[in-house]
Amino acid sequence: MKNSKIFINTKNGSYPILIDSELINNLEKILKLYSIKSSKYLIIFDKNVPKKYIRIIKKKIKKKIILLKFLSSEKNKNQKNVDYILNILLKNNFNRNDCVISVGGGIIGDLSAFAASIFKRGLKFVNIPTTLLAQVDSSIGGKTGINTKFGKNLIGSFYQPSLVISDINFLKSLPPREIICGYGEILKHSIIANKKFFSFLSKNIMKIIKLKKPYIQKSIYESCLIKKKIVEKDEKEKNIRKLLNFGHTFAHSYEATLGYSKKLNHGEAVILGIKSACEFSFKNKILNKVDYKLIQDHIIRINKSLNLNKFFSKKDVNRIVKFTTVDKKNISEKINLILLKKIGKPTYKNFYKVSYLKKFIKNQFNNN
């Protein structure tokens, strides 16, 4: 593929997503091309990003720069760190024409974007996602948020960036586990929206995971395109955007039960969540057997050892169920699950009693 570019158009802002290699080496030109003209920049970056990339970014931005480093951890995505960022912006007299640049994965992006969104009611924000997961998920759509002891992303805002720069070269520095995590979101997008794309993934899974450029670039592009179409129709998640949460009710409850530990990261939780949502759909005669088996086989090819028994036991069932009840999609006393009719056709108005969901989760431990 040539340089891939997608424009996101919403009521609250339009912005481009650039997908290619060597983008960071052309950062100065890109910022100028897309009218990112600021006198000061706060660059918030993940400490795991290779130092050479931070040096390149510093060299390309010939303005006043403040660097702020965080460890990428769900536990660090909190109000305390938001306050820390806001205090730095205030102490250095940032105004609304200045810019925050996030360089890292989804956690750093969420934290940075939320701080930018509430500082003087909105500061310019540029997202440079460095993980596959962030490039295909959190960098698109304007969701920002932080965690609380009550659950994940319960405090946040919708705030669109001015620009997203997805440089594929960053992915070369990631461990295989992180690539698999990002692939889980790509798989989710194909399952809810495009069977042809799902078939492409099934055919080329190893080439994608090994970051072969035409395949990984196409996968990122197609995945972003799916999310773009959904976000443009429903920016604030009133209706169709809820489909992007396929597997996430389960995923978030699995993460929360483990206290957002590194034992299970977000991408792995999403894959487990997809697996659970498909099994729930199949057991309730919503999803047909052929597509159910295609998805389950695909997940096994990704990581055959990824199952609930690896992380939980039956004694964790009550805690898992408890965290599903704080999901933002729920109404009254019922759990709203995003389920699947067939590959490419999800459904988002499926309400079940907590007791019914508890029985299902308990039975999963017998089947994994």
Predicted regions and their residues:
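C-terminal charged capping/lid subdomain of soluble metabolic enzymes
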Residues: 14, 184, 286-368
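ATP/NTP phosphate-donor binding region
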Residues: 2-99
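Glycine-rich beta-strand-to-loop/alpha-helix junction loops that act as flexible
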Residues: 73, 103-105, 246-247
